[in-house]
Amino acid sequence: MALKKFLEDIEHHFEPGGKHEKWFALYEAVATVFYTPGIVTNKSSHVRDSVDLKRIMIMVWFAVFPAMFWGMYNAGGQAIAALNHMYAGDQLATVISGNWHYWLTEMLGGTIAADAGVGSKMLLGATYFLPIYATVFLVGGFWEVLFCMVRKHEVNEGFFVTSILFALIVPPTLPLWQAALGITFGVVVAKEIFGGTGRNFLNPALAGRAFLFFAYPAQISGDVVWTAADGFSGATALSQWAQGGNGALVNTVTGSPITWMDAFIGNIPGSIGEVSTLALMIGAAMIVYMRIASWRIIAGVMIGMIAVSTLFNVIGSDTNPMFNMPWHWHLVLGGFAFGMFFMATDPVSASFTNKGKWWYGILIGAMCVMIRVVNPAYPEGMMLAILFANLFAPLFDHVVIEKNIKRRLARYGK
């Protein structure tokens, strides 16, 4: 109650005419994190619901926690396994002392030894993920608050989701300055220039990642960025399949084959939050149950992916192993599951109409497989498929609405 009274006592300073009027957006953002805003309608409302934009965004934020925690554990585990595979004794100690992530982990009570437990793996993974997330949150939050102050309206809570989604779809070794550049592009160019939350036609997190992919490909793709171990090089499972098919899927540290269950659980290198389809399904179940994410879009993505991957399986190829990848492997490799559950279902950049959502999802699933199979330079296709579908979402809605209008006119004889 003391906090609420304090906020109420200083509120008048941020209202129009107050000495801190220009900082109202920042005050409102902090106050509404803890308490419901006092703004009410002056007429009877048509729909009464305790869930507002802030609560919806917070639920999505919580929904990615399973993937986030597993991603930190997996990133730490992959790094520890690789380090102990390459180095031993004094050489390992030298490597640890030369990397602040490693020595910070040991200083906080963790260990980089081969027998490191869950806590040490989680701790090491956190030293990679949390700085990226903090950088993205602070830099992106700065731009969000700046635009809100200029436009004189409250801070939109959509950035809570954008920041964590962006941090989860990049490699654990991404330089912090590149993370800052990527989120700057996503927030400013893909969102704020078009009017802010609710007016952007591209997914800001994906737009930021696409910017980094084309501007700095060496730090966000290739074989050396996915495992946070100095001097280690290892391709992702999707890249391995693109090179040699199912038989080429091996753990780059132990040399043992990668099974479908390994990929489903997330015991493979990759972007921090994209590796575990199981963890992503848990989070997706939350937002689908709460009707935040559209099940029609998710079903459409699956239908498009299964149909096109099956078509390529039937066609076959002796020179391109990706033609032979079954749909259930497409599901668990790369960023497909993350994109399907948390990116494609973005309510702003996706289609609004029910029929439009089906076609929007089908286009994403089909395009993802086509890019993975046909494009020889880039085995991943989910990011580009969703951004491509974002451009078509308004067209799908326009066609559906026009057809509904014509159907109603014909029904009533006009």
Curated annotation (Swiss-Prot):
Chain positions found as FMN phosphoryl threonine: 236
The keyword Repeat is annotated on this UniProt entry: no
Catalysis: reaction(s): a ubiquinone + n Na(+)(in) + NADH + H(+) = a ubiquinol + n Na(+)(out) + NAD(+)
Swiss-Prot/TrEMBL keywords: Cell inner membrane, Cell membrane, Flavoprotein, FMN, Ion transport, Membrane, NAD, Phosphoprotein, Sodium, Sodium transport, Translocase, Transmembrane, Transmembrane helix, Transport, Ubiquinone
Enzyme class: translocase
Membrane disposition: Multi-pass membrane protein
Modes of activity regulation: This reaction is tightly coupled to the Na(+) pumping activity and specifically requires Na(+) for activity. Inhibited by korormicin and 2-N-heptyl-4-hydroxyquinoline N-oxide (HQNO).
Name this protein carries in UniProt: Na(+)-translocating NADH-quinone reductase subunit B
TM helices/strands, residue ranges: 56-76, 129-149, 164-184, 268-288, 297-317, 325-345, 358-378, 381-401
Species of provenance: Vibrio alginolyticus
Any one GO BP annotation for this protein: respiratory electron transport chain
GO molecular function: FMN binding; oxidoreductase activity, acting on NAD(P)H, quinone or similar compound as acceptor
GO CC, alphabetical: plasma membrane
Main location: membrane
The protein's assembly and partners: Composed of six subunits; NqrA, NqrB, NqrC, NqrD, NqrE and NqrF.
E.C. number: 7.2.1.1
Function according to Swiss-Prot or TrEMBL: NQR complex catalyzes the reduction of ubiquinone-1 to ubiquinol by two successive reactions, coupled with the transport of Na(+) ions from the cytoplasm to the periplasm. NqrA to NqrE are probably involved in the second step, the conversion of ubisemiquinone to ubiquinol.
UniProt record similarity statement: Belongs to the NqrB/RnfD family.
Cofactor(s) listed: FMN
Annotated localization: Cell inner membrane
